[in-house]
Amino acid sequence: ALADREEEGAVHLDIAPNQRYRVRDDHGEALPESEGGAPDKRMIRNIEQAGYEHGGFVRGYTSTVRWRFAKDMTGIGDESELLKSYSKRTQWSIKRARSMGVHVREIGVDELDTFARIEQQTAERRHFEFRGPQYFKQFAQCFGERARFVLAEIDTAEYQRSMQRKADDLRALVDGLEAKIAQRETTKLRRRLNEESSNLAAANKRLAEANELVEKGDLIPAAASMFVLGPREVVYLFSGSVEEYKPFYASALIQHEAMLRYCVQGVEPFGHVNLYDFYGIDGIFDDPDDEGRGVLEFKQGFNGYGGGRW
């Protein structure tokens, strides 16, 4: 009780219950009460009766996460259903990542320096606090198997082979079109040749980039995330990415693999988990220039819902 804290010499005490006040759709609109969108005013009354004062609702990033984005995993039974639940753009991003040789795996404490390095690069780029490698090692020690660190890497040889196949296929297509035009040119064939020639030039450029990437190593870290597992929800708590490898969509693939492994397929002892918590957003849905817009749009692509906390 609040009186107990006063007896212990507390000057000020803040509490932030992990309780939704109101469920909103992925664009911030409150759901109808018939769909569970009614505000939970009872919790405020209970806390006020205990002697606390509600500090009001705020938007923006604060020291305590006040807005979260989550996805209901109920009824999603396999990877195909999971993929179909995303936006078309996000589905494309995940398929694109796989076609470019990106693979996702869990890492242990012995590789946390790689995780921390990516996290630090992201913190410096996006101007948030970096907690340091020791923090993550202590987190892993405290949470044990419930803390999962995930790394997305580019298999450069696989990427090179994929780009070579695409360039070869386009080269064959262009050669075939040129042969047809040599026999009898039509406007349709010429237009198709121009289009595929442009695609071939782009494919050759990507192949040249893949050849350069091979020189950097066999496996190149592109993104990393940390998750906390529980029986009721899986929480996506920390993440980072290497800006240079943004076109590989590694972060999107990590999210998909996490939902698939930890929620749909489930791990012992939790099994299937019905809630995937993308964690913090700033609660600003209507400003395209907001600093948190990119984070929001990334999470919206997985078709979840937003909600304000106390």
For every predicted segment, state its role:
Residues 1-61, 175, 222, 229-304:
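Acyl-donor binding region in acyl/amide transferases
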Residues 305-309:
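Short, polar N-cap/turn motifs at the start of nucleic acid-interacting alpha helices
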